[in-house]
Amino acid sequence: MTTPSLQTTIEAAWESREGVTLETRGAVRDAVEAVLDGLDAGIYRVAEKIGETWVVHQWLKMAVLLSFRLNDMTPVSGAPGGATWWDKVPSKFAGWGEDRFRAAGFRAVPGAIVRRSAHIAPGVVLMPSFVNLGARVESGAMIDTWATVGSCAQIGRNVHLSGGAGIGGVLEPLQAGPVIIEDNCFIGARSEVAEGVLVETGAVLSMGVFIGASTRVIDRETGEVFMGRVPAYSVVVPGSLPGKPLPDGTPGPGLACAVIVKRVDERTRSKVSINDLLRDTPR
């Protein structure tokens, strides 16, 4: 099928998805399988930047969701001690041998789990980590130990996801956009970016920064407030906002936020170490 015919078939199946079952055969199953293979190979991507705007291809998410209706639970080999897992989604690496890994050109150490339909580009390093279905990890990225890349998330070139960092996934609600981490970003250990937040090129998040769609990202120098995105080449640390007084007049609880402590240009970002960028400067 051509891409337009795939899209038409998937969208029609989605409108009548209650009729899509384990017994469904023919064009619908073939279209879903073609999309999963295309996502896995990097031919398709759930979100792409067109000009200066990120565009989400919802029909590809529809295909991923339809696959859950089409595929039954089945044993998945490879669990510790010779045990098996029980799932609808096979490993990306199922059936791979040395030649396939060499051709793929990335490194996957023991404990790295990648589900089918996630795309891993050449030059990526996967430490013991988890990459969910429909996600895309671009060349040169490091997915460090216990980091997670959620469903359909987009990880740019040379991104470093530090130990235990979490990038939220999104399949439902359908209209929600995926988390996007643009090229050359650094996400500190145990930080979490979720709910469709866009982290723009070259941004640095320190350890323990939590950003969702409603989190206020405040530029300390200008007072400007961002929600849903982190501006390019921002250096961001955890912060808090004073809470409103309680009804009895006593101070209320503070609210978490993220604070932009400085901004750097591309040249500085490429030359200065992450530790130096995160070291606060006297006001």
UniProtKB/Swiss-Prot annotation:
Its EC number is 2.3.1.117. Homotrimer. The keyword Lipid biosynthesis does not apply. It is an enzyme of class 2 (transferase). It is found in: Cytoplasm. This is 2,3,4,5-tetrahydropyridine-2,6-dicarboxylate N-succinyltransferase. Its main location: cytoplasm. It catalyses: (S)-2,3,4,5-tetrahydrodipicolinate + succinyl-CoA + H2O = (S)-2-succinylamino-6-oxoheptanedioate + CoA. It comes from Rhodospirillum rubrum (strain ATCC 11170 / ATH 1.1.1 / DSM 467 / LMG 4362 / NCIMB 8255 / S1). Keywords: Acyltransferase, Amino-acid biosynthesis, Cytoplasm, Diaminopimelate biosynthesis, Lysine biosynthesis, Repeat, Transferase. NCBIfam families: dapD, PRK11830.1. GO terms for molecular function: 2,3,4,5-tetrahydropyridine-2,6-dicarboxylate N-succinyltransferase activity; nucleotidyltransferase activity.
